[in-house]
């Protein structure tokens, strides 16, 4: 063996040792890692402490400019009726005759996501928590998913 092959063997051995050390460190701290992720999951897409938005700029969506977690739009399972798009502002709505509003419901999660995060600019919102209907079931559901 010449000195060059010995050098590469030493470098490869050191790299494998570092890989094993990192793997063992993750294995030993896996419980702490899961606890940290669970604690900070709500801040996943919010602005970081440094003020730099932690955003995926490849795709523009309605949540890109919002830093408050409760204001972000999300698709949630609506009891017995599929999926709805909700945020602290209310639900995305369908406007019926006489300008009545009802919650827009989707059959699948994919339909909800596609509609909620599409390029539609003019979206109607129905907030069931505005007086006089503060104690209705729709308002209670909205509060429970936020």
Curated annotation (Swiss-Prot):
Q: Which residues cross the membrane?
A: 1-21
Q: Where is it predominantly found?
A: virion
Question: What's its membrane topology?
Answer: Single-pass type III membrane protein
Give any Gene Ontology cellular component: viral envelope
> What keywords are annotated for this sequence in UniProt?
Disulfide bond, Fusion of virus membrane with host membrane, Late protein, Membrane, Phosphoprotein, Signal-anchor, Transmembrane, Transmembrane helix, Viral envelope protein, Viral penetration into host cytoplasm, Virion, Virus entry into host cell
Entry comment on modification after translation: Contains two intramolecular disulfide bonds. They are created by the viral disulfide bond formation pathway, a poxvirus-specific pathway that operates on the cytoplasmic side of the MV membranes.
**Where are the Virion surface topological domains?**
22-146
A single GO BP annotation from the record?
A: membrane fusion involved in viral entry into host cell
The reply on keyword RNA-binding is no
Q: Where in the cell is it found?
A: Virion membrane
Q: Which domain of life is it from?
A: Viruses
Q: What is the protein's known function?
A: Envelope protein required for virus entry into host cell and for cell-cell fusion (syncytium formation).
* Similarity comment: Belongs to the orthopoxvirus OPG155 protein family.
Subunit structure and binding partners: Part of a stable entry-fusion complex (EFC) which is at least composed of proteins OPG143, OPG147, OPG155, OPG086, OPG094, OPG107, OPG104, and OPG099. Formation of the viral membrane is necessary for the assembly of the complex. Interacts directly with protein OPG107.
Q: What is this protein called?
A: Envelope protein OPG155
Where does this protein come from, organism-wise? Monkeypox virus (strain Zaire-96-I-16)
Taxonomic placement = Viruses, Varidnaviria, Bamfordvirae, Nucleocytoviricota, Pokkesviricetes
Q: Which gene encodes it?
A: OPG155
């Amino acid at each position: 063996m010449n000195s060059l092959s010995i050098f590469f063997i030493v470098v490869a051995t050191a790299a494998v040792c570092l890989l094993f050390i990192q793997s063992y460190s993750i294995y030993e701290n896996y419980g702490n890692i899961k606890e940290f992720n669970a604690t900070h999951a709500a801040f996943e897409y919010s602005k970081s402490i440094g003020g730099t938005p932690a955003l995926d700029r490849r795709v523009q969506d309605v949540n890109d400019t919002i830093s408050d977690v409760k204001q972000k739009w999300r698709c949630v399972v609506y009891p017995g009726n599929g999926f709805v798009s909700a945020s602290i502002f209310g639900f995305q709505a369908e406007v019926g005759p006489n300008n009545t509003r009802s919650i827009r419901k989707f059959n699948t999660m994919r339909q909800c996501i596609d509609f909620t995060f599409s390029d539609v600019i003019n979206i109607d919102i129905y907030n069931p928590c505005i007086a006089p209907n503060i104690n209705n079931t729709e308002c209670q559901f909205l509060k429970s998913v936020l």
